[in-house]
């Protein structure tokens, strides 16, 4: 029992190296390093380079591209290098240090000829022999790696590749529940038991290997322990060994991790997976592991050779000259080369890139407020800053204070505003909001797209229920969509007719005899569909929508807002009256909308439209778990229109005028249009005027927003009709890049809208409304940081990882992806499950970067004590900042910027 508990603990701790991977149909951004944030970003980068040869720093080409585009100021980098050298003293001639730094900072690789030079071997052996204990251990420590990584097969590849192919085959078979007619036998018992049953008959194993499988224990934990003992792995190395196996196929391991969290009967899936993988490794390795030299020693020896070669190359000191020095001097040189390795300079380039963006963002805010200050006849805005030092910055933003100095002025602004539109914080809403505000007396607001409603939605036009909230939070309520009984019966019949047609097609395709007839039966129709979709994608989509509207028109629906009893539901259905009041109050506070209500308040979720796109869900609302957020917007708008809710809000200190009406809409990010989801039948005169005014200017807004967005797409030249072109892109099934999604996201600003209003943030910023003056205890800020900001960081790091290490964290080329098992994409039929973003989502061309891989900059508009309190109360966020997983900056009421590093 003690051993089994130990195995459980090992697996539980080892899960830190992977992240749960949701099916592609409900794709939600995940931070691939969330479980590793107890360590610094730099330490994790070094560890990943050691154990998987994965580099998570921007490479030389990305750095050079950033410099060429003006995104990275070289002077900032040079200052960082100077500051670093001043912190250390080395007893080395200065000209060697200068040569070394000048060469290594270009990130050029050491030529192979240096590694293969005999003198380098001599120096490395000398150091390893004389200084092994105090140098190899202090300079470099390697985790134990899977045995199969150290054995090379007859084809010249690590034996672990054969292990991977076996695991891909078996995991695909287990995961697939919907695409194949036959599922894996005995899968209902467990993955491990189903594999035991089938592997005994798998002739890819030898007869002797199949006999070993027959004799395996029924308990996967016992199997894991048996294999680890067979390989003589020390107990203190169990976790590192298991981590190596999880990192071998992080995609397939990730989907199993996700399923283990979703279903109680699959909670031990990772244990089953590891037991199978370790057995396969044992069978394929056989007795060869006995002849394998100690991996750590050989890697330490190789590390010495690399470090010696680096010193000789970058310092321009020939190896024969190096040999003329005594051992102590050589140790000093190599210590310097080890300390000042290439990863150190990659990290400095990354920091300089981030500091450059931080400086440019402050300059944008400064320039924006200078223009506002001139218009309001307030004091001139002065900026004094030392960007290279990256310390506190002083910017006098008197314009902000002039705009919203007190509540009376805020109320005055509110009465002149026709409509207030609350958008999701998604970076794609920033340009759209800017164009709306420029088009008339409209005010925009930023809030997470789930609008603070922890719900699971049960929509009439969706086959499955969906958790419509951030993936790190479980739903607490279920909201059902329903219509009049007659309308629902008609709609259900239409749905069944359509689904039966698709089911019949699938059934024929997956069975031997009927599949022979299928080409003749479906060929003419599918050929015509292919031609029309290829030649006239936009018209084809419009025609399809008309047919769908005629034959499968969704009826007018209502929502189960009030609490209902449903014995079939594992969640409460609907809200109590007090819960409705509480959620409305919380949402309004998060929007910083508790006074000065406009006559018309629109809650705008967002959705994306694309055709033939497996990663469609990645373009939807991240705060709603990879789905459109119009459902949440409609629910909150309906709640806020209820008289009893308004009465409760009034008692809580929030008065909504009777003339104010809430409505819901969706911002379609691929076409930059606003589609109405819910507009009450009765509008006040002022609300009706605002509604009509907004509709009148929306075509112009859409044209401007689309033109700005399409100009950034690499395959488009001059656009004369941006709206039509955007619709064509969204309809074209051959288009690999219907929109950029959240590429280039870089910052998350939490503050009053006046801080950034009218400033072109280039669609790179998440914008969340917040007023620290109304948040006395800091709970609102903590909520924003723990929810929306966390989602934004996950999105940011997924884009980052997919850019810097696309082979490991991305999903490859869209044109060669294969949708597999209904859960994700592969490259070919024997790759890992690709769980990141495609190449086209982050790159403009094969060698042209689009997304800028920098860590998220969180900006909080609040005094220092508010930010200090946040860091003291939120240890999870404070750790992200201190371990360099994101950057934090604040701006106080006097306009002084401060970097919290």
Curated annotation (Swiss-Prot):
Q: Where are the transmembrane segments?
A: none
What are the annotated GO cellular component locations? Answer: plasma membrane
Its domain of life reads Bacteria
The protein's predominant localisation is membrane
The record describes its membrane topology as: Peripheral membrane protein
InterPro entries given for it?
Answer: DabA
Give binding positions for Zn(2+).
Answer: 424, 426, 606, 621
Q: What does the record give under GO molecular function?
A: zinc ion binding
Record-linked Pfam families: DabA
Where found, per UniProt? Cell membrane
Q: Which cofactor does it need?
A: Zn(2+)
Q: Which UniProt keywords apply?
A: Cell membrane, Membrane, Metal-binding, Transport, Zinc
Q: How does it assemble?
A: Forms a complex with DabB.
Q: What does this protein do?
A: Part of an energy-coupled inorganic carbon pump.
The entry assigns this protein to a family as follows: Belongs to the inorganic carbon transporter (TC 9.A.2) DabA family.
What protein am I looking at?
Answer: Probable inorganic carbon transporter subunit DabA
Species of provenance: Staphylococcus aureus (strain MRSA252)
């Amino acid at each position: 029992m003690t051993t089994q508990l130990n195995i459980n603990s090992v697996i539980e701790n080892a899960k830190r190296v992977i992240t749960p991977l949701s099916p592609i149909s409900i794709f939600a951004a995940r931070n691939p390093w969330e479980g590793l944030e107890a360590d610094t970003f730099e330490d994790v980068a070094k560890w990943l380079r050691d154990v998987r040869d994965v580099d998570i720093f921007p490479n030389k080409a990305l750095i050079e591209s950033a410099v060429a585009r003006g995104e990275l100021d070289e002077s900032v980098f040079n200052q960082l290098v100077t500051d670093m050298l001043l912190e250390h003293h080395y007893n080395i001639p200065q000209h060697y240090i200068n040569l070394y730094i000048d060469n290594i900072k270009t990130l050029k690789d050491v030529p192979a000829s240096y590694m293969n030079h005999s003198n380098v071997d001599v120096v490395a052996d000398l150091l390893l022999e004389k200084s092994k204990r105090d140098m190899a251990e202090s300079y470099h420590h390697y985790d134990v790696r899977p045995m199969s990584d150290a054995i090379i097969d007859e084809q010249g590849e690590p034996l672990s590749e054969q292990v991977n192919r076996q695991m891909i085959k078996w995991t695909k078979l287990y995961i697939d529940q919907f695409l194949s007619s036959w599922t894996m036998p005995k899968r209902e018992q467990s993955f491990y038991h189903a594999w035991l049953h089938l592997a005994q008959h798998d002739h890819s194993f030898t007869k002797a290997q199949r006999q070993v499988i027959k004799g395996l224990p029924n308990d996967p934990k016992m199997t894991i322990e048996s294999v680890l003992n067979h390989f003589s792995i020390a107990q203190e190395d169990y976790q590192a060994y298991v981590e190596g196996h999880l990192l071998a196929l992080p995609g397939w391991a990730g989907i199993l991790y996700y399923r283990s969290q979703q279903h109680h009967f699959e909670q031990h899936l990772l244990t089953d997976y590891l037991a199978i993988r370790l057995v396969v490794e044992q069978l394929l390795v056989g007795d060869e592991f006995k002849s394998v030299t100690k991996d750590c020693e050989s890697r330490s020896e190789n590390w010495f050779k690399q470090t010696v070669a680096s010193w000789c190359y970058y310092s321009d000191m020939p190896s024969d000259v190096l040999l003329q020095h005594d051992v102590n001097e050589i140790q000093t040189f190599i210590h310097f080369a080890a300390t000042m390795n290439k990863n150190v300079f990659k990290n400095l380039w990354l920091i300089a890139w981030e500091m450059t963006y931080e400086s440019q963002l402050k300059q944008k805010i400064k320039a924006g407020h200078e223009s506002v200050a001139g218009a309001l006849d307030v004091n001139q805005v002065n900026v004094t800053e030392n960007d290279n030092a990256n310390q506190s910055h002083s910017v006098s933003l008197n314009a902000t204070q002039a705009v919203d100095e007190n509540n009376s002025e805020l109320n005055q602004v509110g009465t002149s505003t026709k409509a207030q539109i609350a958008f999701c914080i998604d970076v794609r809403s920033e340009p759209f909001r800017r164009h709306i505000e420029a088009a008339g007396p409209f005010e925009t607001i930023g809030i997470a797209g789930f609008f603070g409603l922890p719900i699971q939605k049960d929509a009439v036009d969706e086959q499955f229920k969906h958790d419509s909230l951030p993936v790190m939070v479980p739903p607490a309520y279920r909201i059902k969509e329903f219509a009049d009984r007659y309308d629902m019966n008609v709609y259900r019949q239409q749905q069944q007719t359509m689904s039966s047609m698709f089911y019949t097609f699938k059934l024929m395709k997956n069975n031997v005899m009927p599949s022979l007839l299928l080409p003749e039966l479906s060929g003419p129709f599918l050929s015509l569909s292919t031609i029309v979709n290829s030649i006239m994608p936009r018209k084809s989509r419009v025609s399809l929508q008309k047919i769908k509207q005629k034959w499968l028109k969704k009826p007018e629906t209502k929502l189960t807002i009030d609490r209902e009893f449903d014995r079939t539901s594992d969640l409460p259905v609907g809200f109590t009256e007090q819960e409705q009041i509480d959620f409305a109050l919380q949402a309004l506070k998060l929007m910083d909308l508790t006074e000065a209500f406009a006559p018309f308040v629109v809650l705008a979720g967002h959705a994306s439209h694309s055709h033939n796109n497996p990663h469609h869900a990645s373009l939807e609302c991240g705060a709603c778990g990879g789905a459109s957020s119009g459902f949440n917007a409609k629910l909150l708008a309906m709640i806020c229109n209820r008289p009893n809710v308004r009465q409760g809000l009034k008692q809580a200190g929030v008065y909504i005028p009777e003339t104010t009406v809430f409505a819901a809409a969706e911002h379609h990010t691929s076409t930059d249009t606003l589609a109405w989801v819910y507009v009450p039948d009765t509008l006040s005169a002022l609300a009706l005027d605002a509604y009509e005014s907004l509709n009148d200017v929306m075509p112009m807004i859409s044209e401007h927003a689309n033109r700005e967005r399409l100009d950034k797409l690499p395959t488009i030249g001059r656009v004369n009709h941006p709206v039509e072109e955007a619709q064509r892109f969204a309809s074209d099934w051959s288009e690999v890049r219907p929109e950029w999604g959240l590429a280039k996201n870089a910052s998350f600003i939490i503050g009053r809208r006046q801080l950034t209003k009218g400033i072109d943030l280039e669609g790179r910023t998440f914008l969340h409304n917040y007023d620290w003056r109304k948040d006395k205890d800091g709970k609102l800020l903590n909520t924003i940081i723990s929810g929306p900001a966390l989602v934004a960081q996950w999105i940011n790091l997924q884009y980052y990882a997919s850019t810097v290490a696309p082979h490991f964290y991305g999903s490859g080329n869209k044109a060669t992806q294969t949708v597999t098992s209904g859960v994700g994409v592969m490259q070919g039929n024997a790759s890992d499950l690709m769980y990141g973003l495609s190449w086209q989502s982050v790159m403009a061309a094969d060698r042209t970067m689009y997304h800028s891989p920098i860590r998220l900059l969180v900006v909080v508009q609040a005094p220092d004590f508010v930010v200090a309190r946040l860091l003291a109360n939120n240890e999870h966020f404070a750790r992200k900042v201190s371990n360099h997983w994101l950057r934090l900056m604040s701006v106080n009421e006097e306009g002084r910027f401060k970097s919290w590093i």
